[in-house]
């Protein structure tokens, strides 16, 4: 796919993105700074945050860190997770994000999730206004289904806008995006930047040895990943990683990035120690044979037509 995302000085967005959801929360200032520097040194140029992350601390800390490198980095944030995708909420969120990060322009602004109660024409008319004023450069959508994304793309076009980014959940154990979102994004020339390529940490192998994290601390993540077939896949991934002389997190991120539509997985962590295996995926060469072996650990979802015999 043609490079869709560049920084203000034209630097291409990196193969992986770094998500700062933990900044100012489970990662304090020092840990956040260390992870930012590690990501930067590994070649990451695409950083992702959101208006709602850690009550604004994520954006504030990221803004402080990017200042010396601003023009060569892509900074993406999200609006309207709460409060709806109304013009007033989008404008207020964008302005708050700019203020927190001390940025004149937000490289990318996502609608954080689909709002069934707001006419998307009003939402994208607001995006057009923000782009015209130089507040944003790119437009993204997050947690949209394929039909919602296609509808959004059509409405955006009415305002001479293009949706550049879509952010779905995607990992070895959460593969629904393969059915319609990934092919739709490729067809519409939208860059797919999936989140949770490690399955909430399940694919790191830490829970098998009694480790703690979001799956043990957050009921939402427990409900999302607490299935036997997922635990079995994670265990098998760890065995394959041992055989390959790598870390399961490296293989999991590299597998997600190796999909034929060339997505840009968003990696994240609480510390540099956690982050290092994911960063190693930047240079990992995923062979077709290994990709297929890992894909076979979890059944592929049926096609949208549900005619599995034709898959």
Q: Whereabouts are the PLM-identified features?
A:
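N-terminal binding-site loop/beta-alpha segment at the start of enzyme catalytic domains
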Residues: 1-73
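A structural motif
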Residues: 13, 44, 103-106, 136, ...
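Hydrophobic faces of well-ordered beta-strands that scaffold small-molecule active sites
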Residues: 14-19, 47-49, 75-77, 109-111, ...
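Short, acidic/polar
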Residues: 27-39, 86-101, 124-125, 149-153
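Structural motif
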Residues: 38, 42, 100-101, 134, ...
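CE4/NodB-like, metal-dependent polysaccharide N-deacetylase domain
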Residues: 90-110, 132-133, 157
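Beta/alpha (TIM)-barrel catalytic core signal, keyed to glycine-rich beta->alpha loops juxtaposed to Asp/Glu
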Residues: 118-301
């Amino acid at each position: 796919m043609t490079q869709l995302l560049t920084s203000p000085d034209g630097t291409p967005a990196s193969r992986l993105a770094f998500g700062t959801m933990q900044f100012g929360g489970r990662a304090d200032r020092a840990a956040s700074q260390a992870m930012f520097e590690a990501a930067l040194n590994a070649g990451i140029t695409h950083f992702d945050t959101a208006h709602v992350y850690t009550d604004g601390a994520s954006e504030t800390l990221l803004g402080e860190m990017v200042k010396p490198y601003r023009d060569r980095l892509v900074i993406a944030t999200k609006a309207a997770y709460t409060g709806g995708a109304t013009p007033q909420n989008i404008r207020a969120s964008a302005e708050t994000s700019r203020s927190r990060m001390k940025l004149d322009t937000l490289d990318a602004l996502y609608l954080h999730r689909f709002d069934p109660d707001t006419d998307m024409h009003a939402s994208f008319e607001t995006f057009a206004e923000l782009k015209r004023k130089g507040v944003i450069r790119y437009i993204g959508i997050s947690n949209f289904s394929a039909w919602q994304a296609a509808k959004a793309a059509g409405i955006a076009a009415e305002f001479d806008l293009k949706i550049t980014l879509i952010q779905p959940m995607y990992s070895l154990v959460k593969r629904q995006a393969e059915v319609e979102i990934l092919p739709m994004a490729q067809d519409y020339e939208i860059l797919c930047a999936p989140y949770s390529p490690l399955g909430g940490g399940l694919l790191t192998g830490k829970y098998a040895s009694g480790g703690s994290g979001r799956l043990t601390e957050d009921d939402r993540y427990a409900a999302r990943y607490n299935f036997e077939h997922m635990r079995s896949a994670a265990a098998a991934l760890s065995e394959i990683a041992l055989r390959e002389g790598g870390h399961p997190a490296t293989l999991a991120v590299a597998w997600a990035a190796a999909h034929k539509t060339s997505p840009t997985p968003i990696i994240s962590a609480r510390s540099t120690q956690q982050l290092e295996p994911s960063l190693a995926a930047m240079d990992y060469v995923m062979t077709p044979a290994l990709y297929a072996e890992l894909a076979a650990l979890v059944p592929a979802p049926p096609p949208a037509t549900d005619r599995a015999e034709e898959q």
